[in-house]
């Protein structure tokens, strides 16, 4: 077990303050279920303030859209359980499909629109005349929790993305440097494959962090364009290095050595890259000129080996330019964090960058179908057995399907959620039967909540 550190303790206390603030305002306004506001404040909490802010607006809009669909759907279909189930499955599935396709904070708009409709719609089918009041109350409670969490995490000791993002940028450049060095020095294929996988993971983590940069509370948000440009340059290193590796393998086939000048320029490039932050643009220009001089002229009489050599030189120029751009952008980001303005040409090029992310329609469709099947099975059991709490089960099926849809294998996450839910039953029983009946003021309620919302020892595997 590992005790929480200072940052984790501060994050936990900020989450507690935002939740208690939402709970107090809910009681003051007279909302019917204040616990929704408190729960929402914890659900939207993120360690970095930029992540909370980036998702807040989309969560609000998604909640409103889901509630509006519920108000439209339930009064018209509540008398036909099968049609009502089919309509809800279609809505949740469509929203989840769009959410999985959209790999930006905007995906939360579609996700919230999906499971908010299920969260409000299923419990309202028994009395559809109250669906508008229920939807309005849920929107107010959830919106209050989102606003309170956003305010507290943005104002009280906000934690910027800059330290985490710059560490990830430096790690990506360092891992790229290692892969390039191993490729140019002719390391074994197993080592190069391992280097490539490490860099691919770095690019993924960098993508997840960089989406929140424009919403950050530090100077990092002014470098959003440079961060996106550097992320694209690091991503471009992957095909560039792979292409160099392929050409070198082809040229060295049948135990043929590389020409001495080519081996020398490969060593020079490797030395320049290993210099790290000390690598200069002037050296890159010299290396590019040397590579250009070594490029053979290709005509109809050229051999296949000459064509391979010319292709290798072209890929080396691309590699030099891309790595040099990474270093230049990293220097600009460092200057931007210190408050210096970014250079206009590079900033404009970054702002005009429109990189397209891969959209996995198969994964999105599979997630939507899984959610539809889960909701349909639960609703069939609910309708067939006239289960009094079937609405809660159908609602939770929709929520779990949406929460874990982005994972390749959501089963471990859902099972872990179930295990910790079972573990929480004794503590919940203690509060429900022993502590809550003795509380007669909001102050005592806040103190009682502090006991189970404060930071606690955690397993190292979860850190």
List the predicted regions and their residue ranges.
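A transmembrane helix-and-boundary motif of multi-pass membrane transporters/channels
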Residues: 1-215, 222, 332-335, 339-342, ...
């Amino acid at each position: 077990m590992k005790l929480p550190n200072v940052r984790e303790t501060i994050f936990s206390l900020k989450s507690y303050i935002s939740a208690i603030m939402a709970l107090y305002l809910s009681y003051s306004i007279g909302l019917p279920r204040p616990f929704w506001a408190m729960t929402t404040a914890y659900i939207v909490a993120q360690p970095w303030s930029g992540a909370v802010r980036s998702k807040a607006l989309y969560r609000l809009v998604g909640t409103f859209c889901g509630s509006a669909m519920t108000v439209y759907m339930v009064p018209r279909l509540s008398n036909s359980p099968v049609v009502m189930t089919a309509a809800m499955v279609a809505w949740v599935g469509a929203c989840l499909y769009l959410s999985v396709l959209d790999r930006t904070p905007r995906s939360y708009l579609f996700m919230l629109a999906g499971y908010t409709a299920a969260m409000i719609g299923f419990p309202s089918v028994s009395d559809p005349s109250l669906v508008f009041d229920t939807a309005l109350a849920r929107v107010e409670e959830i919106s209050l929790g989102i606003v309170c969490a956003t305010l507290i995490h943005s104002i009280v000791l906000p934690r910027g993305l800059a330290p985490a993002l710059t560490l990830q940028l430096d790690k990506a450049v360092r891992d790229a440097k290692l892969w390039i060095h191993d490729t140019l020095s002719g390391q074994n294929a197993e080592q190069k494959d391992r280097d490539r996988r490490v860099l691919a993971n770095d690019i993924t983590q960098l993508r997840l962090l960089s989406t929140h940069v424009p919403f950050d509370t530090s100077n990092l948000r002014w470098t959003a364009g440079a961060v996106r440009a550097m992320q694209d340059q690091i991503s471009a290193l992957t095909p560039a290095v792979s292409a160099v590796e392929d050409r070198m393998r082809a040229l060295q086939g049948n135990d043929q050595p590389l020409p001495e000048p080519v081996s020398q320029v490969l060593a020079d490039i490797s030395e320049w890259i290993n210099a790290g932050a000390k690598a200069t643009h002037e050296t890159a220009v010299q290396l590019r000129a040397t590579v250009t001089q070594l490029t053979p002229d290709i005509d109809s009489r050229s051999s296949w080996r000459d064509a391979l050599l010319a292709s290798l030189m072209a890929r080396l120029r691309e590699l030099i330019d891309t790595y040099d751009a990474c270093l230049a952008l990293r220097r600009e980001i460092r200057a931007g964090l210190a408050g210096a303005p970014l250079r206009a040409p590079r900033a404009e090029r970054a702002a005009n960058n429109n990189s397209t992310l891969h959209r996995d329609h198969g994964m999105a469709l599979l997630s939507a179908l899984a959610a539809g099947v889960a909701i349909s099975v639960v609703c069939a059991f609910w309708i067939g057995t006239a289960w009094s709490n079937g609405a809660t089960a159908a609602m939770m099926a929709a929520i779990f399907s949406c929460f874990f849809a982005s994972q390749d294998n959501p089963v471990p996450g859902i099972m872990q959620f179930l295990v910790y839910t079972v573990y929480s039953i004794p503590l919940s029983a203690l509060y429900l039967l022993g502590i809550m009946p003795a509380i007669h003021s909001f102050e005592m309620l806040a103190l009682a909540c502090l006991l189970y919302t404060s930071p606690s020892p955690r397993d190292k595997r979860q850190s």
